[in-house]
Structure formats: structure tokens, C-alpha cells
A protein has these predicted regions:
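N-terminal glycine/serine-rich phosphate-binding loop of ATP-dependent small-molecule kinases
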Residues: 1-110, 124-125, 156, 217, ...
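Conserved beta-strand positions that form and line the central face of beta-propeller blades
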Residues: 41, 113, 499
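Short beta-strand-loop/turn "lid" adjacent to the catalytic site in phosphate-handling enzymes
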Residues: 76-113, 133-135, 168-180, 184-189, ...
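Carbohydrate-associated surface elements
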Residues: 116
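Gly/Ser-rich phosphate-binding catalytic loop and adjacent alpha/beta segment
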Residues: 119
Length: 532
């Protein structure tokens, strides 16, 4: 007999996932079939303190408590009951950054988030030393930059971790990290499912002259993979989450993960030859590889799935913000003439109209650079629209050129994977704001990366659902399936989403667009140099 959602909660068989995003903390409660049955959220913002982006320790715990209180409220309203016991819990958060603690568990400097770019010197030196692309936002870049800057706190370090790792440690007492999140601290060896020992040794030799009382391997969290037990909720941990006191200690907790890994899980993209694209304010693509790349590339970050498979990630700072600004301009026009129109209708109408334009957007070009874009060599950005007098200047082409621009940098990064490394992919699943209007964003992306693109209804549930699925995989995987098979058979069975294949005309049109885009990049560089 099928259990109701209320019975699932009362019998302690629900699973909880909580993810700390950059602007929102979200909690999702799922039933034994992995369906969301309740949720809560809390908005928060980073602060710029002494030139560095951070969230305070107080904001982290207040945010978690507010989010959980909102979840309790939803459970009470829907089912008139309290959450007391759970089958499992999982925590995830934005990856990378730097949280350093001393022997007594005190944080030594304010949490430095992934957004900080003060680590250029360290990242460049480590990339050369490791013969591996080390991005600015990775934890090892932050640590080494602190060393290069002679920061006094470094000698007192006992433990460094990520935001998800910190929360997990505080509520379970375990200094561990899921392999996907760990891969954003320091490179991972997918063969042994642990940090790359050669790189650890190289780092220790590099900093040996400083005579610190620690070795790198002793201050990093222990690496765990999906399905591992990562500890149990302590009484103190339960009180930190649920200020009402209803939540009980002893609940098993899965390895804490990063937002890249939970995004892969939420889109069923952890299997080799699959991938996913997230496209909103910023964008990234992640392709699960069959074999290692032949060499490092500055525009490709190597991370892993939550079960340790190697993943090539292309990250773009800009995606839909400039496009949104143009749509808002059309909304302003509507208001000026007294036209009342819902924003969803405005987006949908303009996006659909864009498909009536030319595949190459009639020669029109847009650079959507609200901020800098490392892949195209820009440390700053200036949103720019460029056309010549002979281009086909129409509304459809104008919107299409901005849609093309939203995935232009993704195209440039992924061309390396497909053209130079000959990476094979069977399925890419897309999620994010760009795909809210059915078919349009999907078609544009399919043409840009020359691959069929699927969109699933559930992908909108995002990372909190992804970490809930990982917690369920640990607690409910009675058949001992691999993570790939568990997701395929227990979660996504029969849900392939809607797939769109790019046409030859669309691919050729986008190729023409991106050729124009690349040849005119000098205009964007000039705009950055001259427009203040």
C-alpha cells in the first residue's frame, strides 16, 4: 500500500536535502519515491568586507535555521505534523572558497567565497607546478595566496574546508567531504578516489621553507563518495538546525557535496558520456568524461561527479543578465503606452519571435559581458550590441542575437572538448532560467554545442533536490546499485524529458554567428579600455 506524505514524515522515512546557494538557501523534503513533499527557503546575500566577498558565521547559521523553520511551516500547513525523525539528511553548498580553522575550531579569517579573485598569483604558480588548470576560486589557490601574502593565521591552521564541509562538521563532528566538493579544493585522482598524492607532495615541498607545523594532507577533509555514511546528527547539530527542538539526533548524514555535483544528480548526468548545462545569471556546462583529457586547458576546470568520475567543466560569468536588461526595456516601453503585460508573457512572446529570425541573427552581434569573462580574455565587461549598416536589423534577429550571445562563451569552451579532445556525449540535460520558455533556449543551446538537449520538469527543483537524492541513495539503496543505476531505475525511470535535436541549418547559422563574434572581440576589448 502506498504511504501518504504525512505517514512518510510521521514514520521518519522522509529524506531532507539542504543547499546553500549564493543568494538562496533551500530545503527539500522527499518521500521514498524521491518526490518533493515539502520545502523551505531563505534569501541571503554575500558582503564585501575588506575587499573580499564573505558570508558571516552568524549569517550561515541564522540562514540555515530560517530555512528549516520555513520548511517546518510548510509541513505544518500541508500535513499538520512536525518533522522529528528522518531517514537521512544531506548538506550541499557553493563550492570552492576558503574556511580555515585552528585547533579549537575557531575560524581564523572570515570565510572567503568562490567569488574572490585575489588569488591570481597563486593559481598561476600552482597550475604551472601541478601541470593542471587550478582556477582562482579553488581552495588550494586561496591557501597558497595566504602563504604568498605572509598572512599570520596560516601557521595556526588545523583544518580547511568548504561551506558544505563546515556545516556537516558542525552538525556531525565529522571532518569529511564528498568527492565532488573535494575536487574543487584540490585535484582528485579518480582512480583512487582521493586527493592526487603527487600534487599534495609537490605542494608540501613548495611551502617547506615556511616551516609550518602542518602538512597539506593533515589539514584537508577526508574524501568520501556517494553512498558512504558520513556520520550522524549530534544533539548539538540537531539544535543548530531546528531551534524548536523537534528534530532528533542520530539521523544518518550523507557526504556533504558541492553545487556542481548536486546539479549533476538533479539532471541525471553522472554517467559517462552525459552532461548538463545550467544557464541563468551565469552558466556552466559539465561533461562526464570516458578518459582523461590529453592536456590541461585554462578554460576547462576538472572536477568529479559525486561518485568520482572525471568531469570537464566550462564556467562562464555571464549568461542572461544583459538579455534580461533588454527585456526590461521592452517592459518599460509597454508601460509608457499603457500596455499591461505579464513578464512571463513578454519573455515568451519575444523568445518565440526570435526563432523566426535568421539562425546567424542576420549578422547582429551582442556581447553580454556584465562582468569580465576569462574564457575570452576579459577581466572586465561592457555589455555591447554591434551591427553594420548592411545587417538584417529586425526584432527577431535582435532578440536572437542576444539569445545566441547568452551561450556564445559556452560554445567557445566546449569546442575544445568536442573538436580538439573528441569527447563523445550521448545526452545533455539543461536547466535554469534560459529554458523557462519551452523550446527556445533549448534550440539555441543545441545549435551552439551541436548536441541534442533535453529539459526535464524536475530539473527546476535544483541542488537541494540533488543532495536529498544523494542522502536517499545512502539510506535507501537496498539493491546496492551504482549511483548511475540508482538514478536511472529508482528516480528518473520513464522521465527522459523533452529532447530537441539541432538542425543542420541551425548549427551552420550559429557557427556563422560565433565566427563574427570572435572576429569582433577587439571591439569589446576597446569598450572595456575606453568606457568608464
Amino acid at each position: 500500500m502506498k504511504m501518504t506524505a504525512k505517514e512518510t514524515i510521521l514514520q521518519g522515512k522522509a529524506v531532507l536535502g539542504i543547499e546553500f546557494g549564493s543568494t538562496r538557501i533551500k530545503a527539500i523534503l522527499i518521500d521514498e519515491k524521491s518526490n518533493p513533499i515539502a520545502q523551505g527557503s531563505h534569501e541571503w546575500e554575500n558582503q564585501l568586507v575588506d575587499g573580499l566577498w564573505t558570508y558571516s558565521i552568524d549569517a550561515i547559521w541564522q540562514g540555515l535555521q530560517e530555512c528549516y523553520t520555513d520548511l517546518r511551516r510548510d509541513v505544518k500547513e500541508q500535513y499538520d505534523c512536525e518533522v522529528e525523525n528522518l531517514a537521512a539528511i544531506g548538506f550541499s553548498a557553493m563550492m570552492h572558497g576558503y574556511m580555515a580553522f585552528n585547533k579549537t575550531g575557531q575560524i581564523l579569517v572570515p570565510f572567503r567565497t568562490w567569488r574572490n579573485t585575489n588569488t591570481a598569483e597563486a593559481a598561476a604558480k600552482l597550475s604551472e607546478l601541478f601541470v593542471f588548470n587550478i582556477p582562482l576560486r579553488w581552495s588550494i589557490s586561496h591557501l597558497y595566496q595566504c602563504i604568498l601574502d605572509n598572512d599570520a593565521h596560516v601557521k595556526d591552521i588545523d583544518f580547511i574546508t568548504t561551506l558544505a564541509g563546515y556545516i556537516h562538521w558542525q552538525v556531525t563532528g565529522e571532518k569529511v567531504l564528498g568527492i565532488g566538493d573535494a575536487s574543487g579544493m584540490l585535484p582528485i585522482d579518480s582512480n583512487c578516489l582521493d586527493y592526487d598524492t603527487k600534487m599534495v607532495e609537490k605542494f608540501n615541498r613548495l611551502v617547506s621553507s615556511y616551516n609550518y607545523p602542518w602538512k597539506l594532507e593533515n589539514i584537508l577533509p577526508k574524501v568520501l563518495v556517494a553512498g558512504d555514511n558520513a556520520g550522524y546528527l549530534t544533539p548539538e547539530g540537531a539544535a543548530l538546525i531546528d531551534i524548536s527542538g523537534h528534530l532528533k539526533a542520530g539521523i544518518p548524514v550523507c557526504p556533504p557535496e558541492g553545487d556542481a555535483g548536486t546539479g549533476m544528480v538533479a539532471t541525471n548526468a553522472v554517467k559517462k558520456r552525459t552532461g548538463n548545462v545550467s544557464a541563468g545569471t551565469s552558466s556552466f556546462s559539465m561533461i562526464v568524461l570516458e578518459k582523461e583529457l590529453s592536456k590541461p586547458y585554462e578554460m576547462i576546470d576538472m572536477v568529479t561527479t559525486p561518485n568520482g568520475n572525471a568531469v570537464a567543466m566550462v564556467h562562464c560569468n555571464n549568461c542572461t543578465s544583459d538579455l534580461n536588461a533588454w527585456i526590461n526595456l521592452f517592459n518599460e516601453y509597454n508601460k509608457l503606452f499603457g500596455i499591461e503585460m505579464d513578464m512571463n508573457k513578454l519573455y515568451g512572446t519575444l523568445y518565440r519571435h526570435a526563432l523566426e529570425g535568421d539562425a546567424d541573427s542576420g549578422g547582429l552581434i551582442s556581447y553580454n559581458y556584465i562582468s569580465g569573462e576569462p574564457i575570452t580574455g576579459l577581466s572586465e565587461g561592457r555589455p555591447l550590441f554591434v551591427r553594420s549598416s548592411t545587417d538584417k536589423f529586425s526584432l527577431a534577429n535582435f532578440i536572437r542575437c542576444h539569445l545566441n550571445a547568452s551561450v556564445g562563451v559556452l560554445n567557445i569552451g566546449n569546442d575544445i572538448l568536442f573538436n580538439e579532445e573528441h569527447v563523445q556525449v550521448d545526452r545533455i540535460t539543461a536547466h535554469g532560467g534560459l529554458f523557462k520558455t519551452p523550446e527556445v533556449g533549448q534550440r539555441i543551446l543545441a545549435a551552439a554545442i551541436k548536441t541534442p538537449i533535453s529539459v526535464m520538469e524536475t530539473a527546476g527543483e535544483g541542488g537541494a533536490w540533488g543532495i536529498a537524492l544523494l542522502a536517499a541513495f545512502m539510506a535507501n539503496n537496498v539493491q546496492k546499485l551504482s549511483l548511475e543505476d540508482y538514478l536511472e531505475k529508482e528516480v528518473f525511470y520513464g522521465n527522459r524529458g523533452t529532447e530537441i535535436q539541432p538542425t543542420t541549418e541551425e548549427i551552420e547559422g550559429f557557427n556563422k554567428y560565433i565566427s563574427n563574434y570572435k572576429s569582433c572581440l577587439k571591439v569589446e576589448h576597446a569598450a572595456v579600455e575606453t568606457k568608464r
